[in-house]
Every structure is written in C-alpha cells, then in structure tokens.
C-alpha cells in the first residue's frame, strides 16, 4: 500500500548515540524508512525498538540535537528528483545540488527504496561492452547490462582504471551515464566533475556523491538514490544506463557502522549480520529489463589484499565479470595492473566472443601460467638452465605482459604520454602474433606501454 505523505507524526528525541537517534511518538509511529526531521537534521527510521519509540539513522551531523528536541515526519520516505533535469548535475543523496547551481528542475520525485525488477521482466543480453583497454577486453570482457567489479587493495590503480573506463565508454555510450561516489575523497569528486566537463560528456551524465566526510547513513543510502535515478531512465525513458560506482566496499563499510550504532551483534570479521541482505537489496536492482539495461562498473576495495574477506566474497557473487588488480604487477610497473590469471568473465565463451577470441585468451592465460610456474626455477638457477621450449615460453610471456600494458588518457598529463584506445580486433591480432612466435627481433621493452603492435612497426619505419 503506498505511503500517505499527508499523515503527520510528532514526537521528541529520547536518546542520541552518535549517528543513531531514538524518537518517541505519543500516538501512531512512522513506518520503516519514513523520513523524520528534528532540529534541521534529516533521519530515516531504521527500526521500532519499543512501544511508540523508533530508532533512526541520522543523515547529517547530530550536533545541536538534544533530549526533548521536537521531531516531525510523515509516512513518506526519502525521495530524489528524477527526469531530464538532473542531467549534467552534481548532486547529493537527496538530489540537492553540489555544483553551486540552483536545484534541478525535475518532473517528479521518487522514493529511494524500491523493489528490484520481477523475474518475468528481466532479460539476459549476451553483448560485450568494448572498453578499448586491452587487458579487460581480452581476458575479462564486460557484459552490457551486467555488473563488473574492479577488485584491488589500496594504491593498485582502481580509481585510475575506473576513470579511464569512464573516459573510454561514456563518450561512446548512447544512453545516460551515472556516477555514484560512495565514501571516497572529495578531491576525486571535484577532479572527475572537471574532467567530464572538459571531455564534453557532462550533459549526458548525473553525478551523485556521499563522500567519506558524510554521515554513515548518507554513505549507506546514496547508492539507492543513484539507482532510483538510473531506474527512471531505464524504465520510463527506455534508455540504457551506464552506472559507475566508486567504491562499493564503502557501502558495506557504512552499513557496518550503522549496524553497530543500531546495536546489532557483529558477525564474522566485525561485519554486520545483514551484510548479504543489504548488498543484495542494492545489487539486485541493477538489472536488464525489456525496456532497457543498467550496466554497472564498480570499484571494490579489498582490505589488506585479502580476497577471502567477507565483503569481497559477497560482492564477487553478484558480478558477471571480475577484474582483479595485482599489487605484484603494480610494483613491476605493469599498468593497468590487471591479474590475467585471476580476472574472470561469464562473457568469455565461444558463443559470445567467438572461437578465435576465446582461443587467444586461453593461449595468453596458458602462457602466463607456465611462466609463473617457471619463475622459481629462473630465480634459483637462471634462465640459461631452461630448455629451449621453456625459454620460448618465457620470451612470449614477458612480451605479452608488456603488450597488455597501456598508456591512459586520464593520467596522460602526469605521465607525459598520450593515451591509447585499442579496438579488440587489434588486441587479438597483437596477442595472436606474439603467441605464434618462437624468436623475437625486438626486445621485450619495446612492447611496453604501446597500443597495437602496428605502433611498433610505425616507430620502426620512422
């Protein structure tokens, strides 16, 4: 039954515990997810803790609130503006402007908590979203209408890789793009806003932020706000949506903070007992329907590089493609630091990408896996002790590792190089040529930070 926003509730604050506030109502009490306002601070009802008392998550600083402060609310929950008016804007989780411009002109407002599409309305699209990044397109192709995770610890290049994916895909994406920043640095938000303006793609993009200085309730709910806007463009406008999230782990982290403040008993490694439920409530809304598709690319911080961490493990289970970033490769300067053996995708099948792509990807993985097995022997005895066959494997593997590096547009100014966008056909041609050779004219350093193999020939001709 839809909420009746005309029903008003009045109560008083009876307890404040950090970001959690208890409010007592003399008569009827608001329902779960209802919006309560006290002293100018917005709060969302999280649970009913006793007769006439609700426990709320504060969505702003609780300074200035005190016992007995008057609180008001309705049956309505938090709503955000939807429509063409939000395009080209930088907003917070309520849809309020962060870009210094007037509030967006929206034709409607919708609640942020919505059910996922019903099973009968979902569709599977066996289509690949080409990114122009060799390592991803070859070994972990992104599903159009699917969910892709960029996994890695601190400092291995998740945000840079996500920025490059935005640069390469948003410009060629024919629908709407939506960026959701959860618990990351405010500096990165400003940089991304400026870069999107310089690239000329801001007018077809919405940017929502709940950054690390915000209350845990904001960081926990901003993802739902972003999905409500994305669902409008998918369902009402029948457009494809590209949803980029940085960082989905911060959503889990905010949920853990909120859970602790609500007094719930923590589960394994200190995470909230409702981790799986909360993550599913967000991820299941990211889906393809008969009217349109939401393609999601999510950066995932992995605490202490531990991929068995419950948060990382639960996020893995929702994804159609996992791009794993390796600290070892990053330390060797092999950027993007995509781990070719750990990264996976359900799209990497002959039926979807074609037999040739599938065979080349398998050949690349097999060669790199053999090289990994030989590393210890090389370290102890030297490469001279290997057989001719094994030396050829090492030569191919080391050139493949360097060929899969790539200069990025988004760090071109800092690195002093021009970015390269490589079509998948040229990536396949280059890998196939390297795999077929047993001896090489050029040193392995020549393959480092190039685009296609044709770039080598152009340099040689010049």
Swiss-Prot record:
It is an enzyme of class 7 (translocase). Pfam families: ATP-synt_ab, ATP-synt_ab_N, ATP-synt_VA_C. One of its GO terms (molecular function) is ATP binding. Its EC number is 7.1.2.2. Keywords: ATP synthesis, ATP-binding, Cell inner membrane, Cell membrane, CF(1), Hydrogen ion transport, Ion transport, Membrane, Nucleotide-binding, Translocase, Transport. It is a peripheral membrane protein. ATP binds at residues 152-159. One of its GO terms (cellular component) is plasma membrane. Gene3D superfamilies: 2.40.10.170, Bovine Mitochondrial F1-atpase, Atp Synthase Beta Chain, Chain D, domain 3, P-loop containing nucleotide triphosphate hydrolases. It catalyses: ATP + H2O + 4 H(+)(in) = ADP + phosphate + 5 H(+)(out). It is found in: Cell inner membrane. The keyword Cell inner membrane applies. InterPro entries: AAA+_ATPase (IPR003593), ATP-synt_VA_C (IPR055190), ATP_synth_F1_bsu (IPR005722), ATPase_a/bsu_AS (IPR020003), ATPase_alpha/beta_chains (IPR050053), ATPase_F1/V1/A1_a/bsu_N (IPR004100), ATPase_F1/V1/A1_a/bsu_N_sf (IPR036121), ATPase_F1/V1/A1_a/bsu_nucl-bd (IPR000194). HAMAP family: ATP_synth_beta_bact. Belongs to the ATPase alpha/beta chains family. F-type ATPases have 2 components, CF(1) - the catalytic core - and CF(0) - the membrane proton channel. CF(1) has five subunits: alpha(3), beta(3), gamma(1), delta(1), epsilon(1). CF(0) has four main subunits: a(1), b(1), b'(1) and c(9-12). Produces ATP from ADP in the presence of a proton gradient across the membrane. The catalytic sites are hosted primarily by the beta subunits. This is ATP synthase subunit beta 1. It comes from Dinoroseobacter shibae (strain DSM 16493 / NCIMB 14021 / DFL 12). The lineage of its organism: Bacteria, Pseudomonadati, Pseudomonadota, Alphaproteobacteria, Rhodobacterales. The gene is atpD1.
């Amino acid at each position: 039954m839809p909420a009746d926003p005309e029903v008003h509730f009045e109560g008083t604050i009876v307890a404040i515990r950090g970001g959690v506030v208890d409010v007592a109502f003399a008569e009827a009490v608001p329902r779960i997810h209802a919006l309560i306002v006290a002293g100018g601070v917005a709060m969302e009802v999280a649970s009913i803790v006793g007769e006439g008392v609700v426990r709320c998550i504060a969505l702003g600083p609780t300074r200035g609130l005190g016992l007995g402060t008057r609180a008001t609310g309705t049956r309505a929950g938090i709503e955000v503006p939807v429509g063409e008016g939000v395009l080209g804007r930088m907003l917070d989780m309520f849809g309020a402007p962060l870009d210094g411009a007037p509030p967006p002109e929206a034709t409607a407002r919708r609640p942020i908590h919505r059910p996922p599409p019903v099973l009968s309305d979902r569709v599977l699209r066996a289509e690949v979203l080409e990114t122009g990044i060799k390592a991803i397109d070859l070994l972990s192709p992104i599903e159009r209408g699917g969910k892709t995770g960029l996994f890695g610890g601190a400092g291995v290049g998740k945000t840079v890789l996500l920025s490059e994916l935005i640069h390469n895909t948003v410009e060629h994406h024919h629908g709407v793009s939506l960026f959701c920043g959860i618990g990351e640095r405010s500096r990165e938000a400003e940089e991304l806003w400026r870069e999107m303006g310089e690239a000329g793609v801001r007018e077809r993009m919405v940017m929502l932020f709940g950054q690390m200085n915000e209350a845990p309730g904001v960081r926990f709910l901003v993802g739902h706000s972003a999905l409500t806007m994305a669902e409008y463009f998918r369902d009402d406008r029948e457009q494809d949506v590209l949803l980029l999230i940085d960082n989905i782990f911060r959503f889990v982290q905010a949920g853990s903070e909120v859970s602790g403040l609500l007094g719930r008993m923590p589960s394994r490694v200190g995470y909230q007992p409702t981790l799986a439920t909360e993550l599913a409530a967000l991820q299941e809304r990211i889906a393809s329907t008969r009217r349109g598709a939401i393609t999601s690319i999510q950066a995932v911080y992995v605490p202490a590089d531990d991929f068995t961490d419950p948060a990382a493990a639960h996020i893995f289970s929702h994804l159609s493609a996992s791009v794993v970033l390796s600290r070892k490769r990053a330390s060797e300067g092999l950027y993007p630091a995509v781990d070719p053996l750990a990264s996976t995708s359900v799209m990497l099948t002959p039926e979807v990408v074609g037999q040739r792509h599938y065979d080349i990807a398998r050949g690349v993985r097999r060669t790199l896996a053999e090289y990994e097995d030989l590393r210890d022997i090389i370290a102890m005895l030297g490469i001279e002790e290997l057989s001719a066959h094994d030396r050829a494997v090492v030569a191919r593997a080391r050139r493949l590792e360097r060929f899969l590096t790539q200069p990025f547009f988004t760090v071109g100014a800092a690195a002093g190089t021009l970015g390269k966008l490589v079509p998948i056909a040229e990536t396949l041609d280059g890998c196939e040529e390297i795999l077929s050779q047993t001896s090489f004219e050029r040193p392995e350093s020549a393959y480092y930070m190039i685009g296609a193999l044709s770039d080598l020939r152009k340099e040689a001709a010049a």
